[in-house]
């Protein structure tokens, strides 16, 4: 909103692990050196796909990056269950999935690739957003990565019981937010949005 600072949380991985090997794609000459460069690369390789779809990045076997992905129809020979620092910190409470995984029920890779395209668009817009922690908060829009399952668990609530109004209400008030008039939700996404808003 004009004249207001807005903090928005989005539920996807903002980048791949880098701290463990010193690179997103070790040994690849074209490996991006920064998160914004990674977003630009994903956008370049997926530019023809609509609605920020990131599938082309995971399916192009001619690119060296493919060797690091567990992708539909092909498990790269360099794929490992690497974790970012933020995921290592979360392990004592919950178990985030590896961002390089693009298949199966625990897949977060495809959604994160779409998210990276979104981050590229937001940060390159005429009125750019700041994507923290890769850029400091600024006037206007700042976007941060969220992990709703963690927010439930940090206050002793069960994320699997998201449809239970009492469980959701307890989770929200656990973050010192006012009790909701109604904690009934129509979907898990709605429950995630409400607990994330309270946590932020």
Sequence positions of predicted segments:
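RNase H-like (RuvC/DEDD) metal-dependent nuclease/polynucleotide-processing core
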Residues: 1-200
């Amino acid at each position: 909103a004009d004249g207001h600072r807005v903090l928005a949380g989005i539920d996807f991985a903002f980048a791949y692990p880098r701290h463990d090997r010193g690179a997103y794609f070790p040994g690849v000459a074209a490996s991006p050196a920064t998160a914004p460069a990674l977003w630009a690369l994903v956008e370049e390789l997926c530019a023809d796909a609509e609605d920020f779809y990131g599938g082309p990045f995971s399916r192009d076997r001619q690119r060296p990056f493919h060797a690091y992905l567990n992708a539909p129809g092909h498990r790269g020979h360099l794929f490992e269950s690497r974790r970012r620092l933020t995921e290592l910190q979360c392990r004592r409470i919950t178990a985030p999935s590896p961002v390089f995984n693009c298949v199966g029920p625990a897949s977060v890779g495809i959604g994160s690739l779409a998210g990276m395209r979104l981050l590229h668009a937001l940060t390159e817009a005429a009125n750019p957003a700041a994507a923290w922690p890769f850029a400091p908060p600024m006037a206007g829009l700042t976007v941060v990565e969220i992990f709703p399952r963690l927010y439930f668990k940090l206050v002793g609530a069960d994320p699997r019981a998201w449809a239970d109004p009492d469980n959701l209400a307890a989770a929200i008030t656990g973050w010192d937010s006012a009790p909701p008039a109604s904690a009934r939700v129509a979907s898990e996404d709605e429950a995630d949005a409400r607990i994330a808003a309270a946590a932020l």
